[in-house]
Amino acid sequence: SGDWSSDVCSSDLEERGSFRRLCELISDLPSFGGSKAQRNVTEFNYRISDAQRAHVFVGLTTAVRGESDKIAAYLSRHKFETIDITHDDLAKEHIRHMVGGRSTLAQDERLLRFIFPERPGALLKFLSLMRPTWNISLFHYRNQGADYGRTLVGLQVPKGDKRAFDEFLSTLGYPYVEETDNPIYRAFLQA
């Protein structure tokens, strides 16, 4: 027993709500190998790039060595085509940092840095408070071992939803900084 790392790359049809479904599925993963230890998401990387498919890089802690192939198979059975990349050095050392870039599909995108509490349900709270008409166009989270997680989120929010979006941010209660006008965002990510 101990903490092991599993990394998977999951793909699904690009439709609103699929990221939330993936997160719910991950939070409900069964135990493979008898361990009762809770899994934690250590990393999420995503950028909208295709109207038909989404590619999400997910890192998880596991309690049993060799669990990653079972996790990948489980996610695939639930309609998330998944590749176990636990032993793929190219993916783990380089590609994980290159997820993203400019996207012509990210219309009406607002970019925000959030401080998520490191506790179960924090991400699902965020997702459940979002309006179904808003779309996550970018998501980057990496566990740094603190009691909070720095998260960068791109949300497609129609201009007419400004008041509702402000209410969402207030109700959520997580500290945030809007970066939509940041010149680095405009240079590297905004289409």
What are these model-predicted stretches?
Residues 1-8:
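Single conserved hydrophobic/aromatic residue that forms the stacking wall/gate
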Residues 11-18, 61-66, 114-122, 156-160:
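Short, surface-exposed ligand-recognition loops at beta-strand->loop->(often short) alpha-helix junctions
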Residues 19-41, 105-150, 154:
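C-terminal accessory/binding modules appended to enzymatic or scaffolding proteins
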Residues 41-44, 77-93, 136-139, 172-187:
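Conserved short beta-strand edge segments in small beta-sheet-based binding/regulatory domains
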